Amino acid sequence: MLPEPVPVVAAGWCGRLRRQQLVAVLMLPLASLAHAAFPDFSQVRAAHRPSEAVWLDRHGQPLQVSRIDRSVRRLAWVPLRQIAPVLQGAVIASEDQRFAEHSGVDWQAAAGALVERLQGSPRGASTLSMQLAGLLDADLKPGSDGRSVLQKLAQVSAARGLEQRWSKAQILEAYLNLAPFRGELQGIGAAAAGLFGKQPHGLNQGEAILLAALLRGPNAAADVVARRSCELAAQLKARVGCAYLQGLGAQALAARSNLADIVLAPELPALLPL
């Protein structure tokens, strides 16, 4: 009896995977060298610049805000202790459920993503550390077809390097300050102020879930954001329902607050650049 033929699609995938694995092995030393001098957390935080400059009177009180960076809207760096724990938990649940356990790469999630890709349903498996590496290094920015094999390898190497030099708290803090949330809003300070008129420490559970849901697709349509928010709320066993999240999202995404007004608000001093 003749053996059953191997499906062409499976064989093609196996061949591509073997080639990618070979490239990964050959390029690993280069990727490691490229990220040996990755910046310290203190350097990244010190280099952070708000997109708004605040003019003060002779008594040190804010008078006027001028935008100095037209590419993004970004407020002052927000320490992790000033970010609502409910938001931190929602982001970890949405983006990296084993954040506290892995060393930069979640191999379990990566294996699951590979299986789904073979089945024709691709999904991401990037950890918060990997995403942060992509935000810190312009060379890791994905192209129109996503990241190349070499970029993915370098991203893995960079994430592992970050985990060796930074604490988990520093990784989470930097990610929340650098990640794009919606349109030109970058970082949790601008996102909380621009969408909800709040400081990050004042976010409630519904707002936290909505912001976490935005991270996977900052410019996704409102109905997509609502669906992701509903799924995340169910995952977290949250006290808020889908109808509430849908209404909250529609309102926040349609009517964005004026960041200049937020920065000048006397009850929001933590948003002023140091």
PLM regions: where:
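N-terminal type II signal-anchor transmembrane helix
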Residues: 2-5, 12-58, 63, 98, ...
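Coil-to-alpha-helix initiation sites in intrinsically disordered, low-complexity, charged segments
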Residues: 11-12, 148
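N-terminal post-signal-peptidase region of extra-cytosolic proteins
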Residues: 38-41, 71-80, 94, 156-157
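Short Gly/Pro-enriched turn/cap motifs at secondary-structure boundaries
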Residues: 43-45, 123, 151
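Flexible, acidic/glycine-enriched loop-and-adjacent beta/alpha segments
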Residues: 47, 79-131, 186-191, 196, ...
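Solvent-exposed coil/turn segments that connect beta secondary-structure elements
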Residues: 49, 58-61, 68, 83-86, ...
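Non-catalytic, structured segments within soluble enzyme domains
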Residues: 125-274
